[in-house]
Amino acid sequence: MKVHPYDQWAPDARALDLVGDKWTLLIVRDLVGGPRRFVELQRVLPGISTEQLRSRLNRMVADGLLTRQRYREVPPRVDYELTERARDLVPVLGALAHWGYRWAWGAPRRGEEVDVGAILRLAPGLLTPPAGLSGTVEMTVTERSKEPASRTYVLEARNGRVSIAEREAPDADAHLAGPESAWVRALGPDADRQSLELDGDARLAEALLDAFGAEAERAAGASAAA
């Protein structure tokens, strides 16, 4: 693999030398919520081979985008985590998602891998919550055909920003839950949330969902006006 594939003295080319390879930005996206082990990254990136993932992670560690933490456990455990350099890419992911909403968004295609968490993990770079909105929403996605059968995410809105973590939050201000198909309808172009179960602060939960929907709606409007 060539270390500097573009060999051009320009800041965008220098940036693409580091993050322009296939899978790199998706790995950053999938580590936004916190460190992951190798097998966890394999789960959320099913299209990448074991050797490709190992090579890409090694390169990202060498480039200062990731840290690798080894634990003395049986079996051995290695965690990968974003560095400050990589966290500065979160707004870049948000801008890329904005572009995708405007020009490439739609219902899942035949054969396309569906991972609701992949959309939720974009929240820190994508969403700008309404002024004064503050609180946490626990979001649970269930799909019996997958392992594990349910995944739980916590989105927190505070000071005009949104953060995400993959954990349970029994004391969250609001709880949203539903099967994967319900989340696809809720986060897709139709923004149909009727099949999601809501408990707690409805205003907060709906505002965060609206933030996803607003991006899609705003993008669709911009596309129609273009």
What are these regions (language model features)?
Residues 138-192:
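Low-complexity, glycine/alanine/valine/leucine- and proline-rich hydrophobic stretches
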Residues 169-226:
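C-terminal interaction segments
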Residues 11-48, 58:
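N-terminal helix-turn-helix DNA-binding core of bacterial DNA-binding proteins
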